[in-house]
Structures are given as structure tokens and as C-alpha cells.
Amino acid sequence: MINTAKDPNELPRVREHALRVAIRLDASKTPEAIQAMAKDQNSSIRKSAAFGSRYVREKAVVPILIGMIADDERFVALSAVQSLWILTLHETEFHDWDASTKADRQEWMAEWTEWWNGEKETFQIPEPRRRSPKIQG
């Protein structure tokens, strides 16, 4: 599955599906595929890598996602930062992603890089937030 996800000659939908399956089977083995997909020319492949990363509880995906914040495509960058928020629980200033330019996103990537450089040695991926059970009434 990992090799299929990384293969630039494979159909995009096949690669995206291969990544989803690989994450379900053993997420700890997927950062290498996510890294390859994050650099793909096809923006839907990059978005799939950014989105899928939120289910990979490995520190190795954090710098990959940080690098994706400055992506040319806003929707890829937004997916990357949402995955970062989910994985790290790191709170950042509010930024207007809808109106952002590539220069804005490069600045925001620098903010995340600075944070990561200070945290990466000791950082532990926190437990995922659990949804509160609905109160029966």
C-alpha cells in the first residue's frame, strides 16, 4: 500500500485510497508515503496527504505538515494546518485563510517552524480529543 501511495505513475484516486488503507492498517508506517505525496505536482494528492496525516500519530508528520502550510493551493495549506491543530493541539493566532496569499502562508509556516524547533525534542503527540457523550434527557 505504501509503495502504491508513493507511486507518481499511479492514478491519483488509487494513490489516495492506498494511503487511507495504509493508515488504517498501520499508521506508523505511513510518514514516508505522506512525505512523497506532500511534494506531488497534483494538488489533490497533496491535500490527501495533508488530510490523512491527522490520523497518523507520529512526530514525523509534523514537519511535513508545517512545510505544506505554504502550499500554492490554499485548500492544501488549510488542510495541513487543520491536521497540525488536531495532532499538536497547538493554538495559534487566528489567520484569514480564505483571503491568504502564498506570502501570508509562508509567514505562518515560519511561525509554526519556530514553534516546532522549540518543541520537537520533547514533544509528544497528545491523546486525541474525545467527543463528549451526548446527555440523554
Regions found by a protein language model. Give the residues of each.
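Terminal, low-structured helical/coil segments at or just beyond the last alpha-helical repeat
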Residues: E93-G137
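TPR/TPR-like (Sel1-like) alpha-helical repeat modules
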Residues: I69-R74, W85-L89, K102-R105
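Conserved hydrophobic register position within alpha-solenoid helical repeats
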Residues: A18, A49, A80-S83, W112
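Amphipathic alpha-helical scaffolding segments comprising HEAT/armadillo-like alpha-solenoid repeats
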Residues: M1-D7, A27-K39, E58-A70, H90-D98
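Short inter-helical turns and helix N-cap capping residues of alpha-solenoid HEAT/ARM repeat scaffolds
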Residues: N9-L11, Q41-N42, D72-E73
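Core register positions within helices of long alpha-helical scaffolds
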Residues: V21-R24, G52-Y55, S83-I86, W115, ...
